[in-house]
Amino acid sequence: MSVLEASEIMQLIPNRYPILFMDRVDELNPGESIVVTKNVTINESFFQGHFPGNPVMPGVLIIEALAQAASILILKSEKFAGKTAYLGAIKDAKFRKIVRPGDVLKLHVQMVKQRSNMGTVSCQAMVGDKAACTTDLTFIVGATDSK
């Protein structure tokens, strides 16, 4: 059973298809941690060009999926309700496993530190029991621009 479904996720973050990379939130401990599921299917638009005959999810999109999961974690706090979380930095990103159609990505994000409207999270994208990607992300929370 999920904590948040896709429609609830879209109420929190501005991302939409084809750049929304999460299907559901499985676990959420506000201000502490989140676990999100992304089912990777052959229908993803990026597989048309990356790579024909050998589909591989681009590493930068795995990072984006982790950043979106981090956004949910951050924006579910009362302090940042109605705001937007922006990616400020990517540190020590490592890609350890190729992600392919049919894989289920489990995105694990843990709050490391937060000060004012900035903070750092530690992230892992898992396929089964193997880490596909690990990284630390820095975020900045700002007003939602309605322009």
From Swiss-Prot:
According to its UniProt record, where is this protein located?
Cytoplasm
Which CDD domains does the record cross-reference, listed alphabetically? Answer: FabZ (cd01288)
Gene Ontology molecular functions:
(3R)-hydroxyacyl-[acyl-carrier-protein] dehydratase activity
**Known SUPFAM superfamilies for this protein?**
Thioesterase/thiol ester dehydrase-isomerase
One BP term from GO: fatty acid biosynthetic process
| The enzyme's E.C. designation | 4.2.1.59
Q: Does the keyword DNA repair apply?
A: no
Which organism's genome codes for this protein? Lactiplantibacillus plantarum (strain ATCC BAA-793 / NCIMB 8826 / WCFS1) (Lactobacillus plantarum)
Name a Pfam family for this protein. Answer: FabA
Q: Which family does it belong to?
A: Belongs to the thioester dehydratase family. FabZ subfamily.
Protein name, UniProt field: 3-hydroxyacyl-[acyl-carrier-protein] dehydratase FabZ
> Where does this protein chiefly localize?
cytoplasm
